[in-house]
Amino acid sequence: LLSCVAAAFEVDGVSLEGLLVFQGKQGLGKTLWFKRLAEFNKGWLLEGATLDPKDKDSVKKAVSHWIVELGELESTFKKADINQLKAFITSKSDEMRLPYDRTFTNYQRRTAFFASVNEPEFLMDGSGNRRFWCLKVTDINPHHGIDMQQMWAEVKSTLYKQGEKNWYLTKEER
């Protein structure tokens, strides 16, 4: 959540260190929980995205949203694609040529990524998986009744507490 707020408020964009992954059986409400994060503005969330970092349209679609849920990550990315995904999600900016533009433009990243998976063994990367922060979900309540605007205000307050920027993992957390 801190990464989401940093993506929204950091003027120079933000390089996120990883993505939160909910792993659990089908039908628990993992995607619905992510949808609740931006329930007050549906245009801020892209749910069930299939992202191809090599495809400009896929990238443009993803980074046009504040929060992107990569649905069913294990079926979207092959083992060879995971390194590209890790590099993409941690990038601070995106270089794109929009339709009808003559030149490429560098856009500061304003997007935070989340993912959901069903199978526990979706990570098969021998080089390490520190970019994927996995939470095993056995039960989740997407209808929790929490005021999401208030929640985001509190997250922002925590992020910029006394002028500090606290969204990066500490050495111990890595």
PLM regions with names:
Residues 13-18, 45-46, 54-70, 76-89, ...:
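Feature primarily recognizes SF3-like P-loop helicase cores of small DNA viruses
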Residues 1-63, 67:
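P-loop NTPase catalytic core of nucleic-acid-dependent motor ATPases
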